[in-house]
């Protein structure tokens, strides 16, 4: 294209029938604009986490309850931590419920999460936190375990399924036996009440000879 424009520019004065063309082979680069330097980052080397611990359990109905403890040189205020849960299939999601700060000192921070329903196949609970707003993010993980009492009268079938998922088969079979005995006694009690209120009175009215003294 540049070669064609060059031929036309040289031929135009001779022919006298074409206007003059301005020939620009290269555009000049724009001038450099000086920008203000970025402010220096603050020194955050003094903030660090020296110890972290996580405890989490699953109560009846798949309700997650977790407690995290952090120790170290932490900023005031501390950034809000984030909590995620991961299932066996690899699916992860953030817990929208904010954790509760139950700290008693500035050196040790304690965060508590309670009564949040998670899937029964939850494998890990991840807790992300930072000692300051510009510090590196740390995380600690814990594997929730189903909390079932020794007399699991109020445990559900979902809790037994969770015990099998955790490979705690002995506890799962024990809970299933207790629940079966509980349901059996409840059915016997219902049958006795139904017999005393309805069946026995109906028999008295229609078959009085069944309750005579001759029998």
UniProtKB/Swiss-Prot annotation:
Keywords attached to this entry: Disulfide bond, Early protein, Glycoprotein, Host endoplasmic reticulum, Host membrane, Host-virus interaction, Immunoglobulin domain, Inhibition of host adaptive immune response by virus, Inhibition of host MHC class I molecule presentation by virus, Late protein, Membrane, Signal, Transmembrane, Transmembrane helix, Viral immunoevasion
Cellular compartments per GO CC: host cell endoplasmic reticulum membrane; membrane
UniProt KW Disulfide bond keyword: yes
Topology in membrane: Single-pass type I membrane protein
Lumenal topology ranges: 18-182
SS bond partners: 56-142
Glycosylation sites: 73
PTM comment text: N-glycosylated.
Residue intervals of the Ig-like H-type domain: 47-146
Keyword Signal: yes
Signal peptide annotation: 1-17
A Gene Ontology biological process term: symbiont-mediated suppression of host antigen processing and presentation of peptide antigen via MHC class I
Transmembrane annotation, as ranges: 183-203
Cytoplasmic topological segments: 204-215
Cellular compartments annotated: Host endoplasmic reticulum membrane
Subunit (UniProt): Interacts with host TRAM1.
Function noted in UniProt: Participates in the inhibition of the host immune response. Redirects newly synthesized major histocompatibility complex (MHC) class I heavy chains via the SEC61 translocon to the cytosol where they undergo proteasome-dependent destruction. In consequence, infected cells are masked for immune recognition by cytotoxic T-lymphocytes.
Family: Belongs to the cytomegalovirus US6 family.
Name by which UniProt lists this protein: Unique short US11 glycoprotein
């Amino acid at each position: 294209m540049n070669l064609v424009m060059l031929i036309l520019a040289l031929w135009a004065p001779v022919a006298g029938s074409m206007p003059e063309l301005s020939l620009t082979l290269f555009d000049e680069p724009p001038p450099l604009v000086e920008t203000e330097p970025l402010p220096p980052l603050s020194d955050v080397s003094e903030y660090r986490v020296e110890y972290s611990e996580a405890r989490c359990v699953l109560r009846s109905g798949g309700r997650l309850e977790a407690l995290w403890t952090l120790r170290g040189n932490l900023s005031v205020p501390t950034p809000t931590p984030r909590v995620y849960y991961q299932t066996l299939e690899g699916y992860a999601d953030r817990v929208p419920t904010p954790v509760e700060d139950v700290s008693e000192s500035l050196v040790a921070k304690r965060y508590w999460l309670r009564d949040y329903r998670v899937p029964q196949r939850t494998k890990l609970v991840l807790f992300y936190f930072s000692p300051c707003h510009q510090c590196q993010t740390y995380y600690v993980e814990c594997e929730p375990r189903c909390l079932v009492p020794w007399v699991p009268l109020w445990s559900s079938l979902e809790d037994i399924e969770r015990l099998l998922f955790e490979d705690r088969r002995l506890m799962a079979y024990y809970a299933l036996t207790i629940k079966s005995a509980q349901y059996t006694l409840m059915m016997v009690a219902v049958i006795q009440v139904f017999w005393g209120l309805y069946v026995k009175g109906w028999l008295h009215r229609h078959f009085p000879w069944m309750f005579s003294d001759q029998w």
